[in-house]
Amino acid sequence: MPIAGTKYAPFPAPQLDDRTWPSKRIEKAPIWCSVDLRDGNQALIDPMGHDRKERMFRLLIDMGFPEIEIGFPSASQTDFDFCRWAIEQGDVPDDVDLQVLVQCRPELITRTFEALEGAKTPIIHFYNSTSELQRRVVFAKDVGGIKQIATDAAKMIMDMAAKAGGGYRFQYSPESFTGTELDVALEICNAVIEIVKPTPDNKLIVNLPSTVEMNTPNVYADQIEWMCRNLDNRESLIISLHPHNDRGTGIAATELGLMAGADRVEGTLFGNGERTGNVDVVTLALNMYTQGIDPGLDCTDINRMKEVYEYSNQLKIAERHPYVGELVYTAFSGSHQDAINKGMKARRSANSPVWEVPYLPIDPQDVGRSYEAIIRINSQSGKGGIAYILQADYGLNLPRNLQVEFREIIQHITDEEGKELPSKRIYEEFQKLYVTQPDARIKFVDHHTYPDPEQKGRRILTAEITDNGVTKTIEGKGTGPIDGFVDALSKYLGVKMSVVDYSEHSLQQGSDASAISYVEMVYPGGKLFGVGINDNIVSASLEAVVSAANRVIAK
């Protein structure tokens, strides 16, 4: 790359030593305006036809956007026709205002009013570019010439609105605001304000777009705060933000801009738009939601939002996209999985409605996702993740030492195969190793116990087993069935074994529930686990002992 300082110069930042926005907090949601059907649509390789537009439009209404920019009706017949459809057949709720975009050109303004005939309180959004670069390179005009473009358009729009009988709302944008000197932007905006003559009951929207993101988010916040302080008739204005994401900080710039005094945000679902996109209003809304602020948008079915986005825009959402990507509620890391597992357990036992689970800033169910894919297993996964999957999907509450033991088995498989293991495969490996044991030597069949006549408090157990398919009867003594069965197997196999840990639980609810038992067995070479599942709790325990014994003699 060329030396940075010889090819690129830093864009100047305003001097605002008494800025107040850093100490502010976002306390309420802004007025939201979707520009998916205009700014988003113009950025598509294959712009939307009517069906794709209508599907997006219905979603935006269902989500609760109070303002929706439906197109640039003077730019194409497609946009004009959709505007007419929305007004005549779109069943637009009374609390939703439709917005259209128009350049400051007389013939386009006339066509725009034709498109809006019969609309309820439509917003006419007129704009012209004001930046130093575009004044010099594109328009070859001085500040006075650029200001006249804006004021001539404002006069024409106000005259036509008056003749049409009123009911219109107005929005002006000094396009490429972030590349415009602040005093120039102020001069042009104030000139438009003077013509529109807004009131507190009929406010003018002054939109201050970061058409191209040119600086750090704090600079945009300084620009917004400066304009909020200096614009004429501020109480009669709605200050709007329209950030883009060229530097990857559109979300941060918007949030700081709201702290700096803005009232409104224009953006798109999941950030579709020219170049790197417009600001993502879904991420903004859910950022607020997770801070306890009502976002004013309904994001409870984020899967539908994703589906409509991908259908209407013919674009795919990245797997790591905040809140909506396939993997954003998923942990592969062992330490993360362990923390999530413990957090979910703590939440189940807590009596607080507050969401507090490590590594999950939002409850996936709040946006229509499930807990099924929170933890997924690969070579980076730990015991907590595997335990969570077996508990969540199959109702198995593995003892901690068994979690450690089984994790090593799964680790070996993932290292060998080099890919993620789905939940079903993990359960199948658990069943094969501990429960079904298809190649096992010993199988449990039945048992009986009776008091030991020679020693009070102890019992004699006789058990029927098969050894490589041959039926055998074995006998042992102990304080109970498990103790006696371990004694019998130890003598029969010639290996001293003893149980050091035992636990069990039901696999379902009700009187016909199966039981699962876990035993940790010590033998001369170490210790390991066995697992048994049976309708009878005692039989499940003895099957767990056989499971462990089979693993001992297989070593």
Curated annotation (Swiss-Prot):
GO terms for cellular component: cytoplasm
Primary localisation category: cytoplasm
Region ranges (Regulatory domain): 437-555
Domain of life: Bacteria
Group of enzyme by EC: transferase
Gene Ontology molecular functions: 2-isopropylmalate synthase activity; acetyl-CoA C-acetyltransferase activity; magnesium ion binding
Statement: the UniProt record of this protein carries the keyword Metal-binding: yes
Residue positions binding Mg(2+): D39, H242, H244, N278
Catalysis: reaction(s): 3-methyl-2-oxobutanoate + acetyl-CoA + H2O = (2S)-2-isopropylmalate + CoA + H(+)
Enzyme Commission number(s) of this protein: 2.3.3.13
GO biological process: L-leucine biosynthetic process
Boundaries of every Pyruvate carboxyltransferase domain copy: 30-303
Cofactor: Mg(2+)
Family annotation (CDD domains): DRE_TIM_LeuA
Subcellular location per the Swiss-Prot or TrEMBL entry: Cytoplasm
Annotated keywords: Amino-acid biosynthesis, Branched-chain amino acid biosynthesis, Cytoplasm, Leucine biosynthesis, Magnesium, Metal-binding, Transferase
One Pfam family this sequence matches: HMGL-like
InterPro entries: 2-isopropylmalate_synth_dimer, AIPM/Hcit_synth_CS, Aldolase_TIM, IPM_Synthase, LeuA-like_post-cat, LeuA_allosteric_dom_sf, LeuA_N_DRE-TIM, PYR_CT
Functional summary from the UniProt entry: Catalyzes the condensation of the acetyl group of acetyl-CoA with 3-methyl-2-oxobutanoate (2-ketoisovalerate) to form 3-carboxy-3-hydroxy-4-methylpentanoate (2-isopropylmalate).
Family annotation (NCBIfam families): leuA_yeast (TIGR00970), PRK03739.1 (NF002991)
Family the entry assigns: Belongs to the alpha-IPM synthase/homocitrate synthase family. LeuA type 2 subfamily.
Assembly mode: Homodimer.
Protein name from the UniProt record: 2-isopropylmalate synthase
Species: Brucella suis biovar 1 (strain 1330)
Primary gene name: leuA
